[in-house]
Amino acid sequence: MSKLAAPLPLTDGHLLEDFDSGQPSLNEFLQQHALAKQRAMLSRTYVATRENRVVGYYTLAFVTLNSAEAPRRIGRGMPDSIPALLLARLAVDRREQGRGLGRSLLVDALRRVWEVMAHGHAPVRVLVVDAIDESAARFYSRFDMTPSPV
């Protein structure tokens, strides 16, 4: 098996066609929408690859949370809008599942969020996640992640 490359921003050169996470909507987003949304500056998708073939990805986007809808520990004492980064998608190809790649992608996302926060690149108070289903929600809950109200 070829070496796994660290996550980098998605480009035209990445091979997407064979990606299959088992979740059709996650496959479709990567293969048909991720690059266009990135070019429009709506989100940024980072991909892990083997020989340029995408084996996992995650997508980050800036959002604002309504403080009244946010969990108390986040919304208490905050103005009406709370700046946040949304981990909108995280998916691993079926052939790579069960090997820790999902965890590695989450750690990489957290590192990038920390860099944004620590260096003041953008005002971000919190990272929230959008779990696609109960299985994903359980995955995120193991890392004390807060489901997104957006």
Language model feature labels by segment:
Residues L30, L106-V116:
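Short, well-ordered amphipathic alpha-helices
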Residues S43, I82, V124-V126:
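Short coil/loop residues immediately preceding or within conserved phosphate-binding loops
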Residues E96-A109:
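Conserved acetyl-CoA pyrophosphate-binding loop and the N-cap/start of the following alpha-helix
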Residues A88, D93, I132:
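Residue-level recognition of the GNAT/N-acetyltransferase active site
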Residues M41-F62:
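Conserved beta-hairpin
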Residues Y57-R89, H121:
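Conserved acyl-donor/pantetheine-binding loop and adjacent beta-alpha core of acyl/acetyltransferases
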